[in-house]
């Protein structure tokens, strides 16, 4: 059948099972929006308040569902406003297709109105980028883009379409999209070598990253941990891949990881990294990371092997398939003395906080209790992000959504909106500091417009908490540009944008506020006032080895 480029785009989105797109219209993309209007019963379009919010919403949708998130923007500033969201998705391996329209082909390269080489701008932060100048290749380009976005190590793909292509016509033939194949690239000998190393270990430890969630390998990870009788630590991206209430679970590793995980990994004789990339925030000083251990790395991306840490063995391939094959090669191991030692560390070094005043750790524990750990938690970046990771028990994958690699302030609210649309039966709560919330709080208008029942918790300490913590510990308490004591009333802002607002100043007010927000089934902001001096512990100083982890008690003893 003969269709315009815009109609072909919509049909290809339907082929891919896309039910929601997030975006903002403009002149160059008008033809596409006209086609979307005609198919609004099949594909829902969420009009965000800013294109960055659209990118973050597509990201949150993708992380919460496992499907490809789709965002759209017009040429020029519309396209460039997507850049931070695309980079966020790239750093955390999130499948996304960003669709932009550009000026017509005769105007390209002439500094035309709202012309930007968005494919060039995003080249370093996408898996692939396409510029479509011919309607005949549009359908195949879209199909390739979705395949690239979700296959192997997922990531964002850009499709930039000139406006004349969206109006031109050609023959369109629908196709049936086949599921992606799970690929492995190791030999039987390599698999057996890894199994032998595991069997010889006396003090194994499992280090779990976001790849376990991406591949859907939670069941295989749990079986693996039981088979080799090992404790499990995770990264920010790995939250929920392993049951956070399991006795084997020792919490996060790295800069704000638990003492148990950091000390345990420093003592182990075998470290098995599952879908983890040895980020600098995890390893600390790489020369002294897990220096007593042989290291095995399982990852879908061959480029990650030996990139940050030299390993003794590796298996490259889809983690779920790899673990299925590896588990079949393993006999049941038992390490009672090692596990008893880890349990002693857990008992000796529990997470602690000052429970006299209202604090973010207390708030997260109350949210955990009220929701029974069943909510989807999104976060922005900073102290609140770490507290949300530490004090909520994540028992299932795709329930903790946070910007780990790029560390994007302003990420959480858009992501929460996307997650709520993707998982409408879940309670979705965004945890943000007052500094982060300022950056994209306009997306409350989006939640209000569509009555998306997200809960926005603002942890308000009137400072840029994480930066201020570093200034306190390492910069002589010189608080340069980290004090936010001004006249902003977040509750009034929320109400002005059409949301319900609740202010919490006491511990006993937290649970009722959360319960009320859930019951309202409408967008709600809860502002929680906490002390400016609260700090995130444990902590590993930048450049130090993870065995040098310290907490508030250690600081008191030193003073």
Label the predicted regions.
Residues 136, 174, 292-383, 507-508, ...:
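Phosphate/pyrophosphate-binding active-site segments
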Residues 46, 180-184, 403-406, 476-485, ...:
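A short acidic, glycine-rich active-site loop
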Residues 1-330, 366, 370-373, 453-456, ...:
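N-terminal alpha/beta PP-like core and its mobile active-site loop of ThDP/TPP-dependent enzymes
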Residues 114, 449-542:
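Thiamine diphosphate
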Residues 295, 367, 379, 418, ...:
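Hydrophobic, well-ordered secondary-structure elements that form the walls
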Residues 411, 415-453, 459:
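Catalytic phosphate/nucleotide-handling subdomain of diverse soluble enzymes
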Residues 27-29, 76, 93, 156, ...:
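Glycine-rich phosphate/pyrophosphate-binding beta-alpha loops
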Residues 6-10, 14, 18-19, 32-37, ...:
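Active-site diphosphate/adenylate-binding microenvironment
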């Amino acid at each position: 059948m003969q269709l315009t480029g815009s109609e072909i785009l919509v049909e290809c989105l339907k082929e891919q099972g896309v039910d929601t797109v997030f975006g903002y219209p403009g002149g160059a993309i008008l033809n596409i929006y006209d086609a979307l209007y005609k198919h609004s019963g099949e594909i829902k379009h969420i009009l965000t308040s800013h294109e960055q919010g659209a990118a973050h919403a597509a990201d949150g949708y993708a992380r919460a569902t496992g499907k490809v998130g789709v965002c759209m923007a017009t040429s020029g500033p519309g396209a460039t406003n997507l850049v931070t969201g695309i980079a966020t998705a790239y750093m955390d391996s999130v499948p996304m297709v960003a669709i932009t329209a550009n000026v017509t082909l005769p105007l390209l390269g002439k500094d035309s109105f709202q012309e930007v080489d968005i494919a060039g701008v995003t080249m370093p932060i996408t898996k692939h980028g396409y510029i479509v100048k011919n309607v005949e290749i549009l359908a195949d380009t879209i199909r390739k883009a979705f395949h690239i976005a979700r296959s192997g190590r997922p990531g964002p793909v850009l499709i930039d379409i000139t406006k004349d292509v969206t109006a031109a016509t050609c023959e369109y033939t629908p196709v049936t999209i086949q599921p992606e194949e799970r690929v492995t690239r190791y030999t039987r000998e390599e698999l057996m070598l890894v199994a032998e190393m595991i069997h010889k270990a006396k003090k194994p430890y499992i280090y779990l990253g976001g790849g376990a969630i991406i591949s859907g390998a939670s069941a295989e990870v749990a079986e693996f941990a039981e088979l080799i009788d090992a404790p499990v630590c995770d990264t920010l991206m790995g939250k929920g891949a392993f049951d956070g209430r399991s006795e084997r679970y020792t919490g996060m590793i790295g800069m704000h990881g638990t003492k148990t995980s950091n000390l345990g990994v420093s003592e182990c004789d075998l470290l098995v990294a599952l879908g983890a990339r040895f980020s600098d925030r995890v390893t600390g000083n790489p020369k002294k990371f897990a220096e007593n251990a042989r290291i095995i790395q399982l990852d879908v991306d061959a480029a990650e092997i030996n990139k940050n840490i030299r390993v003794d063995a590796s298996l490259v391939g889809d983690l779920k398939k790899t673990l299925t094959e590896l588990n079949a090669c393993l006999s049941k191991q038992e390490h009672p003395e090692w596990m008893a030692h880890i349990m002693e560390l857990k008992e000796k070094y529990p997470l602690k906080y000052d429970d006299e005043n209202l604090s973010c750790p207390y708030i997260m524990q109350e949210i955990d209790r009220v929701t029974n750990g069943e909510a989807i938690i999104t976060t922005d970046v900073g102290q609140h992000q770490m507290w949300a990771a530490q004090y909520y028990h994540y028992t299932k994958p795709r329930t903790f959504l946070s910007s780990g690699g790029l560390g994007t302030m302003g990420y959480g609210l858009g992501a929460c909106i996307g997650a709520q649309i993707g998982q409408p039966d879940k309670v979705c709560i965004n945890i943000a500091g007052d500094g982060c919330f300022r950056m994209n709080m306009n997306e409350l208008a989006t939640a209000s417009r569509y009555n998306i029942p997200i809960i926005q918790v603002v942890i308000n300490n009137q400072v840029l908490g994480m930066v201020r913590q570093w200034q306190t510990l390492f910069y002589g308490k010189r608080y340069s540009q980290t004090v936010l004591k001004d006249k902003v009333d977040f509750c009034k802002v929320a109400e002005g944008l059409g949301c319900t607002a609740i202010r919490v100043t006491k511990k006993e007010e937290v649970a009722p506020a959360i319960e009320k927000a859930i019951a309202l089934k409408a967008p709600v902001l809860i502002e929680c006032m906490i002390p400016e001096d609260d700090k995130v512990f444990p902590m590993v100083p930048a450049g130090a080895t993870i065995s040098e982890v310290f907490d508030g008690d250690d600081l008191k003893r030193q003073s």
